[in-house]
Amino acid sequence: MLIWALLSSVIFVGSNIFIRFYLGSVHWLALIWSRALGAALILGFLVYFNDPKELFLSYFTEISNRPLLWLLTVSTGFLGIWGFIKSIKLLPLYIVIPFTTLNLVTVLVSHFRLNFLIENVTLIGIFLGLIGLFFLLKSHYSSKNKNGWFWMILCVISWGLAYPLSQSLIQSTSPIFFATAMEASVVLGASLLLVSLNKSKRRQVLSTLPSPVFYSWMVTLLVLGVICDGIARESVSPISMLAFAGFSEIGVLVLGHFFYQERMKSIQWLGAFLTLLAMFLVLA
């Protein structure tokens, strides 16, 4: 089953390049919708191959059993995505990308089952949510240039919290189930934000989104990546998945170096380090 993990990483390299750099530079809504459309397509496959009534009943049961945990997981993941996009607009990519790859550390933390982190993560998540809301409001009344580091740190912390939260959910459900539910929840938040905009602003946002042909290609990549990742996680250890996630990040960094030559001159050294780290983890 290692072939599925490898295939997942190769596919994610291509999709991450465009999602993180192209869609992120177009508009944050474009990035979120691209992931949500992929989740919707995966849900379509699940409905096609399973009993729809039983499938949606299992969704409802899972969410109703632990609603607070689901809410915190989705909100921290959403804050992480938002913080990443805001930091891309305010800081050079050679600063943003290395810091946001710190979320790989949380995979290691979860692998060694540091339960004290998961036990206290609910209170931390609530506290982080309040801080995140404060920064969102504050950004409307202060200079954009001063907030770049704020958003990047918020992104790293949010993703760091979202991962152990999501791991505790994945323990009782399949990875594909979880990925679909979480992405669908995120697009609901994006839709509510879009509805809250006035008519002219909404038209301006929608006019910046990529073409349907581009979306079709991007969503196909995401679906293939998530399906391969879900199959791989059923039989591959978390430490091996960390290694392949490292390879995926390396691809994003190296290809990003060629697309943004003038802005990422030193990134290949980080890529080389991550390559060695990933190889060590695979062999270990």
PLM regions and their residue ranges:
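Membrane-interface interhelical linkers
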Residues: 1-91, 118, 138-151, 184-235, ...
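Short hydrophobic/small-residue motifs within alpha-helical transmembrane segments
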Residues: 9-10, 74, 101-102, 157, ...
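Interfacial helix-capping/hinge residues at the ends of transmembrane alpha-helices
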Residues: 15-20, 81-85, 96, 104-107, ...
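Juxtamembrane helix-start motifs in multi-pass secondary transporters
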Residues: 31-32, 96, 178-179, 241
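Alpha-helical transmembrane segments of compact multi-pass small-molecule transporters, enriched
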Residues: 38-42, 99-114, 185-189, 225-226, ...
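Hydrophobic transmembrane alpha-helices of multi-pass small-molecule transport proteins
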Residues: 43, 102, 119-138, 267-284
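Hydrophobic alpha-helical transmembrane segments in multi-pass integral membrane proteins
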Residues: 43-54, 107-121, 158-176, 221-235, ...
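C-terminal transmembrane-helix exit sites in multi-pass transporters
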Residues: 84, 103-124, 134, 193, ...
